[in-house]
């Protein structure tokens, strides 16, 4: 199984267990992509998933830098502005979350960072 897909599967399972409803996976528009989009009682979540196989030199979540954050914010805006998604704009809040998975010896270490960042000037 592909590392990215396995990490996204774990992220979806975790999020559903914690009150989220998954509405999209691997949403794309041109060069923009969002790994997972969920809804919960607080609003809509745009989730970036990072998966790595141990040993790692840096935690996967550290790979969501400023440029990636800007691209994700642009993707979220494109998603919400698409004609069939306009009703989601009524959600209370939009959140940008990061989900990290490190695979080692048949086990997975998962970390969820809700509201990992707030996009600015996108």
Give the predicted meaning of each segment:
Residues 100-122:
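Short, low-complexity, polybasic intrinsically disordered segments
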Residues 1-26:
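Acidic-basic catalytic patches of nuclease active cores, encompassing PD-(D/E)XK
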Residues 32, 45, 95-97, 111:
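Protein kinase-like catalytic core scaffold
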Residues 21, 44, 93:
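Hydrophobic "anchor" residues on beta-strands that sit immediately upstream
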Residues 34-57, 72:
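Conserved catalytic cores of phosphodiester-cleaving nucleases, focusing on short active-site segments
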Residues 27-29, 51:
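Short, glycine/acidic-enriched loop or turn micro-motifs at the edges of active sites
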């Amino acid at each position: 199984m592909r590392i990215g897909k396995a990490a996204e599967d774990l992220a979806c399972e975790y999020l559903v267990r914690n009150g989220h409803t998954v509405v999209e996976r691997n949403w794309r528009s041109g060069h923009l992509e969002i790994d997972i989009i969920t809804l919960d009682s607080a609003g809509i979540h745009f989730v970036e998933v990072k998966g790595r196989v141990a040993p790692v030199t840096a935690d996967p979540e550290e790979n969501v830098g400023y440029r990636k954050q800007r691209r994700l914010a642009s993707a979220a805006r494109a998603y919400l502005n698409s004609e069939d998604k306009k009703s989601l704009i009524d959600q209370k809040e939009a959140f940008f979350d990061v989900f990290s998975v490190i695979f080692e010896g048949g086990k997975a270490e998962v970390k969820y960072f809700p509201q990992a960042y707030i996009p600015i000037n996108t």
